[in-house]
A protein has these predicted regions:
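Solvent-exposed serine/threonine-rich low-complexity stretches and specific carbohydrate-binding patches
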Residues: 2-12
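C-terminal edge beta-strand
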Residues: 45-49
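Local beta-strand/beta-hairpin segments that build beta-sheet-rich folds
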Residues: 2-4, 44, 106
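Short acidic/polar inter-strand loop motif in beta-rich domains
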Residues: 36-42
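Beta-strand/loop-rich accessory regions of lumenal/periplasmic or secreted enzymes
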Residues: 10-12, 18-27, 36, 50-272
Length: 272
């Protein structure tokens, strides 16, 4: 087949390089040669790479906007209310102000993002909202917001799919002279009886199976990409794909805080 050759400068004792590859079926020979301009000879390492048949690559099987059974199409009631199968979500900007499961409220108060600056807590307040998409399978909204009493500018977007998944993105723009945020916290207040069992978190590079031990009062951890709180009948699941743009001291163990009782809920300290 066609040979491809490319050189890479060596920087340090360990280095990762990306070798161009068309990723097509077949057997590839990889040859690594290490040489130094002022020395004769080279170190040569050869390896084989076998790419098996990949008949699914590039096809569109299963890619559809169809609402699959038993879910139902999204229902739009206005004023930020969107219904999905057995549930109703009410949005205030990027976050839920209420979610009801079978008519039972899950949140005991709206989800809240707040910035602590110079000892004062400034809540995020939505100033504009626009609907960007309203399909049976997916809803998209976006808008602007402010942290009351600060010069921070905020742009946000949110999308929801017919299975009840909702994802929010919030971008903060500081003033030209800069601004110090002592803490940025996202609080999800939940109905106390829902915060009974904990599941999720990482274990040896994978998601942990089974329930997590906790005393039902306070549970603290560093960054975790996934946490599910529940009782025997209902639950609330949070996930974040990475801790990119989270700012915290190394080893911090208060980035994810779960509380039970009257203060039940999940709190994320994005900046601490």
């Amino acid at each position: 087949g066609k040979a491809h050759e490319e050189g890479f400068p060596v920087r340090g004792e360990e280095q990762t390089v990306h070798v161009p590859c068309e990723f097509k079926e077949g057997e590839y020979t990889l040859v690594y040669r290490l040489s130094q301009p002022d020395r004769e000879g080279e170190v040569r390492v050869t390896g084989k790479l076998m790419i098996p048949p990949l008949p699914w690559v590039g096809n569109r099987i299963g890619v559809t906007n169809e609402v699959l059974s038993p879910w139902s199409p999204l229902a739009y009631s206005g004023k930020g209310v969107i219904g999905c199968w057995n549930r109703s979500y009410t949005f205030d900007g990027p976050f839920l102000s209420q979610a009801a499961n079978g008519g039972n409220p899950i949140l005991r108060a709206p989800i809240r993002l707040s910035a602590l600056i110079d000892g004062t807590d400034h809540p995020l307040t939505t100033t504009s909202t626009q609907s960007d998409m309203q399909r049976p399978d997916r809803a998209e909204t976006s808008g602007k917001a402010v942290f009351q009493g600060t010069p921070l500018k905020v742009a946000w977007s949110n999308w929801m799919e017919y299975d009840g998944l909702t994802v929010a993105t919030v971008a903060l723009e500081p003033p030209p002279e800069g601004l110090t945020i002592d803490r940025l916290s996202l609080t999800m207040p939940l109905r106390p009886d829902i915060v009974k069992y904990l599941r999720g978190t990482r274990h040896m590079g994978a998601l942990r199976n089974g329930r997590l031990p906790w005393d039902g009062k306070v549970w603290r951890r560093g960054f975790e990409p996934y946490l599910w709180v529940s009782n025997e009948y209902e639950g609330f699941l949070y996930f974040c794909e990475s801790e990119a743009n989270w700012v915290h001291p190394d080893g911090a163990q208060d980035l994810l805080v779960v509380k039970g009782g009257e203060d039940a809920g999940i709190a994320l300290n994005l900046i601490s």
